[in-house]
Regions:
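Second-shell loop/turn segments in exported
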Residues: 15, 40-48, 67-73, 95-100, ...
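Residues within well-ordered alpha-helices
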Residues: 1, 24, 57, 79, ...
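Membrane-embedded segments
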Residues: 17-88
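Flexible, acidic/glycine-enriched loop-and-adjacent beta/alpha segments
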Residues: 69, 73-129, 198-208
Length: 208
């Protein structure tokens, strides 16, 4: 399965709808002529919900006893979360693994609108209604900060727990490595810490 998300919108031959990919994995599980799945992962641009759906489908595929092998020149945080479910995860010896956690940034327009003389007419009901805040405030309200933090934490917890279960690494260690951002500097560290099985070039993986 080559990463069709990497070139989404560019007319690439591997472009598919999510439901088609999930159906393909389901059929592959039942097809006795298919021994396993090889994931060649590029730079994912998919959302967390789609990644989770594909990942769950791959977990279901593995219940058949068939293998899943993953390779990337570079792993973004999203595609590593997906590929961590594989039996073997390979990284290019010159590659990086991005694992830096999640963050959210909000742009505020009130100052600009004040300068150009634009006055917004806003009707806001309820505490946790943050959509209009960029037009009426110059920073996050505590309520909006709370709900954004809750949303991000839920996604991050799902990522770390999934990786921990698949790779046998504790959630605490994953959070530590993410905070340190070590993997940008040294791909060997990804193997030492258990995130990557081996550093191999693409032809070596294809011959695996």
């Amino acid at each position: 399965i080559r990463d069709y998300y990497a070139s989404r919108g560019l007319g690439d031959v591997y472009k598919r709808q999510l439901k088609d990919l999930l159906e393909t994995i389901r059929i592959a599980k039942q097809n006795d002529k298919i021994a396993g799945i090889y994931i060649e992962s590029g730079l994912l641009s998919s959302g967390s919900a789609s990644l989770e759906a594909i990942r769950r489908s791959l977990i279901d595929f593995k219940e058949s006893g068939k293998f899943v092998v993953a390779y990337a020149d570079n792993f973004t945080q999203g595609n590593y979360f997906l590929c961590s479910v594989a039996d073997k995860v390979f990284l290019n010896p010159q590659g990086i693994l991005e694992l830096t956690g999640l963050a959210s940034q909000t742009l505020f327009y009130k100052g600009l609108m004040d300068k150009v003389g634009i006055e917004m007419q806003i009707f806001k009901v309820g505490t946790y209604k943050g959509a209009v805040e960029p037009f009426m405030l110059d920073k996050l309200s505590e309520a909006n900060r709370e709900q954004i933090q809750s949303y991000i934490s839920t996604i991050w917890d799902n990522i770390t727990e999934g990786i921990a279960e698949s790779r046998g690494i504790s959630v605490n260690d994953i959070n530590h490595y993410a905070n340190e951002g070590l993997f940008f500097a040294d791909p060997v560290k990804t193997v030492e810490c258990g995130f990557i099985d081996e550093l191999k070039y693409k032809p070596e993986v294809e011959a695996y």
